[in-house]
């Protein structure tokens, strides 16, 4: 499921993909382990109130690659890699084209695991992320790798400043069935890597019962 680059709203007229507020159950986009998940390449979209699950092994559940998008009350779980990740759309994209100014609001990501139990985070904004991205009021728990992963490396250079506020990360490195896996990094909030520094902002966040470090 891909929203291609160029299918855009505007600041004054966003495009909405929103669940029926009167529905008795939440809509579920289930890829049943067969394919890649959902990719957002457009700008100025507003998503609210649905679940994304079942991406194939090694495939992210939901990838945000556009700009100025809002994801509100989205749940990503039991995907074959990271539940929700902000990263570039194409390998040829330059920093100016990396996803910027996206708001991830009141979202939850849990139970995401690749077969090697070493790469699937709850949330990630890593490697190829632009400026002004924000996570607010989100929860990551019981993912195989980290709760949040903001990894950067020298080959692609520093990423933009990420703001994480009012968020909770717990139980990562142990899946919800209680089985502990030691292959992943298992941090609550991983805020960099490879000696490539970015002054990310973390405000009013809580991390507990993760397999490794709460904040690193």
Task: Explain the meaning of each model-derived region.
Residues 2, 31-40, 55-64, 80-86, ...:
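Short glycine/acidic-rich loop motifs that flank beta-strands on beta-rich extracellular proteins
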Residues 4, 18-20, 41, 48, ...:
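Feature marks extracellular polysaccharide-active and adherence modules
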Residues 5-7, 42, 66, 90, ...:
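Small-residue (G/S/T/A) turn/hinge positions that recur once per unit in extracellular repeat modules
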Residues 5-60, 113:
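Right-handed parallel beta-helix/beta-spiral solenoid domain characteristic of secreted/periplasmic
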Residues 8-11, 21, 97, 156-157, ...:
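Extracellular/periplasmic catalytic domains that process cell-envelope and extracellular macromolecules
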Residues 73, 166, 180, 193-216:
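Extracellular beta-rich repeat passengers
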Residues 90-98, 177-180:
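Intrinsically disordered, low-complexity Ser/Thr- and acidic-rich flexible linkers and loops
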């Amino acid at each position: 499921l891909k929203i291609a680059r160029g299918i855009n709203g505007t600041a004054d007229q966003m495009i909405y993909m929103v669940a029926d507020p009167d529905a008795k159950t939440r809509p579920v986009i289930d890829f049943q382990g067969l394919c890649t998940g959902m990719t957002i390449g457009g700008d100025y979209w507003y998503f609210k109130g649905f679940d994304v699950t079942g991406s194939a092994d090694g495939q992210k559940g939901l990838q945000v690659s556009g700009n100025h998008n809002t994801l509100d009350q989205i749940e990503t779980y039991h995907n074959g890699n990271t539940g929700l990740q902000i990263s570039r759309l194409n390998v040829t994209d330059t920093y100016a084209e990396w996803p910027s100014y996206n708001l991830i609001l009141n979202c939850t990501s849990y139970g995401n695991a690749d077969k090697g139990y070493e790469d699937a985070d709850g949330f990630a904004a890593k490697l190829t992320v632009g400026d002004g991205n924000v996570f607010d009021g989100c929860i990551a728990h019981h993912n195989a790798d980290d709760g949040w992963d903001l990894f950067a490396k020298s080959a692609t250079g520093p990423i933009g400043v990420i703001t994480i506020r009012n968020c909770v990360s717990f139980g990562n490195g142990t899946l919800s069935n209680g089985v502990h896996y030691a292959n992943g990094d298992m941090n609550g909030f991983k805020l960099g890597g490879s000696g490539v520094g970015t002054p990310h902002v973390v405000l009013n966040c809580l991390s507990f019962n993760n397999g490794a470090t709460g904040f690193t």
